[in-house]
Amino acid sequence: MGQDLPLLLSAALGKKVNRPPVWMMRQAGRYMKIYRDLRERYPSFRERSENPELSYEISMQPFHAFKPDGVILFSDILTPLPGMGINFEIIESKGPIIEDPIRNLNQIENLKELNPSESLSFVGQVLSSLKKDVNNEATVLGFVGAPWTLAAYVVEGKSSKNYSLIKSMAFKEPGLLHKLLDHFAKSIGEYLKYQIKSGAQVVQIFDSWAGQLSPEDYDIFAGPYQKKVVDIVKAEHPETPVILYISGSAGVIERMAKTGIDIISLDWTVDIEEACKRIPSGIGIQGNVDPGILFGNKESIKERIDNTFNKTKDRKYILNLGHGILPGTPEENAQTFFEHGKKLTY
């Protein structure tokens, strides 16, 4: 049975593998010409991510180009929001805009319970097609946004530099925010279960903005709700590996390890050797490579990959970037990342 599992899934489960698996956050996207050409034909991000044929095609673009060990669903962390009654749009140069930001009790009480098979059936379609067509040549990954990050978007109404609106709610009306976070935790847990049933073999939780919290506030507003999502998933799918990623996580790594996840995805602001000492040995590590290195020459990319890998010693490790690959990254440098990553050996 172990031989039939794809490499990334085997590694995530802690099985013995010959090399670390490699994939990239945002591996399908703007740095690829084939994606930019498709975007010209379909300028709406929501159409690209919610039309199952387009989402499937985009998800597969990097698989055809680079053969990564993971194929991640092309979607967005905000995709489940309309199913809860929160509408949004993604403007190309500005990012997400929430049409009616959530800022009072009445709005929170009127949120719908998410029914993924009803409002997100296109996601299920894409994942089941990926699982069938990738055929265990790679691991199919699903993903969600964590409650704190979703709340940050819906309260602020858009991306924010200082998060003053959600922090104002956190410190003036914490009960209100906890109600919103709890709603999101239940809905996101259900959404992840739906992704797994549809074909996702490994799932990643993005709490992109939890790094904006002090460790003390992380313990109040982020960690408990990450754990609630994980608990909901693990109750039904105890064997499915769960990865947690936070941007700017250096101050909360130990706390991340207490949420029940299997793998911590590191950004590049922490030394991976130090992180290995701070994270319990049973928990795997992913990422840590600065995406900016992919603007360098091939030798510097290879050297950084080698240095990062060598510091992980005998840890369960998945080669990835410390953030999504950046727009404008030369495609041949992404190719180097994947090719060199596959040459690593234990």
From Swiss-Prot:
Pathway: Porphyrin-containing compound metabolism; protoporphyrin-IX biosynthesis; coproporphyrinogen-III from 5-aminolevulinate: step 4/4. One of its GO terms (cellular component) is cytoplasm. One of its GO terms (biological process) is protoporphyrinogen IX biosynthetic process. Its EC number is 4.1.1.37. GO terms for molecular function: uroporphyrinogen decarboxylase activity. CDD domains: URO-D (cd00717). It is an enzyme of class 4 (lyase). Keywords: Cytoplasm, Decarboxylase, Lyase, Porphyrin biosynthesis. It is found in: Cytoplasm. Its main location: cytoplasm. It catalyses: uroporphyrinogen III + 4 H(+) = coproporphyrinogen III + 4 CO2. InterPro entries: UROD/MetE-like_sf, Uroporphyrinogen_deCO2ase_HemE, Uroporphyrinogen_deCOase. Substrate binds at residues 26-30, 76, 153, 208, 323. The record marks 76 as: Transition state stabilizer. PANTHER family: METHYLTETRAHYDROFOLATE:HOMOCYSTEINE METHYLTRANSFERASE RELATED, UROPORPHYRINOGEN DECARBOXYLASE. Belongs to the uroporphyrinogen decarboxylase family. Homodimer. Catalyzes the decarboxylation of four acetate groups of uroporphyrinogen-III to yield coproporphyrinogen-III. This is Uroporphyrinogen decarboxylase. The gene is hemE.
